[in-house]
Amino acid sequence: MWLLEKAGYKVGAAEPAARWAPSGLFSKRRAPGPPTSACPNVLTPDRIPQFFIPPRLPDPGGAVPAARRHVAGRGLPATCSLPHLAGREGWAFLPESPHTRRRESLFHGPPPAPAGGLPAAQSRLHVSAPDLRLCRAPDSDTASSPDSSPFGSPRPGLGRRRVSRPHSLSPEKASSADTSPHSPRRAGPPTPPLFHLDFLCCQLRPTRESVLRLGPRGGQLRLSTEYQAGPGRLRLRLVSAEGLPRPRSRPGSGGGGCCVVLRLRPRVRPREQQSRVVKCSANPIFNEDFFFDGLGPPDLAARSLRAKVLDRGAGLRRDVLLGECETPLIALLPPLGGGLGPGSSLAPTHLSL
């Protein structure tokens, strides 16, 4: 029916025999006037209402962020106070607002001129070649994180300059830049490197590394000891075992893996602590921590550490002793004279027993 109406046929009401009567392909000329639309709520290019944008209120404080001034300066000047703007076809459209732009668009503009009295770059990322540490310089003065608002993103000019410059500065330039009186500095300890836990350990309590000789068949254990005098807690870190003898092949014993059992004598609670069972080899690596609580300074001098390396039996098999040793506990501890005093050192102490 729609196709017939488009072709010029219409229903004939005068002749009942003929249901369809042809009409002219061109309809009669209508009277001049605004056309009536069946859907007045649909926006078409020939019908766009006039939008009104209220003027921007002046800032009472007078302090506008630098990123906001930069984005507003690149936009259309004096457009926010106009009711609308007319394009080439005469259509009304909304002006571009900095609040509706994506954050990535801030990096595509030309480098702006730096404000007077402000440094060119206030936060830098340094990459050191040996261990690829990413750390933030201590002179960064960022007020808020970049994820809090789109205006917290770095300026586009700074990012472009940072890419074009070489990867690192020479020691002479770095020292001259650090000693400049105009370079801002923030009081406080330096920020530790990201993705690196070794730097955090150097600011903790001093530790002592020891090597315990095993008998009777040889081998040794590597330990790292740390003591907290406040809670009376002793931490023993079992690093690895080296040079362990091969387990003797006996029927009904061994074959389940290697483990280390640590015990303080005279006995304290817990009586003994056992490491996880690893694959039996000549140099197994454990990297486990053992904690003994309730040990005051007088108790440390009266106790000793006993360590046994076992080849665990699988199923109903018996354990096989690979080596054992016993050492006075006071010989494994770091100096207890005051942690970070002038006479103490943060460097680990090596001891071979």
Curated annotation (Swiss-Prot):
Residues 217-343 form the C2 domain. Gene3D superfamilies: C2 domain (2.60.40.150). Residues 135-191 are annotated as: Disordered. It comes from the Eukaryota. Transmembrane segments: none annotated. Pfam families: C2. PANTHER family: C2 CALCIUM-DEPENDENT DOMAIN-CONTAINING PROTEIN 4D, C2 DOMAIN-CONTAINING PROTEIN. This is C2 calcium-dependent domain-containing protein 4D. It comes from Homo sapiens (Human).
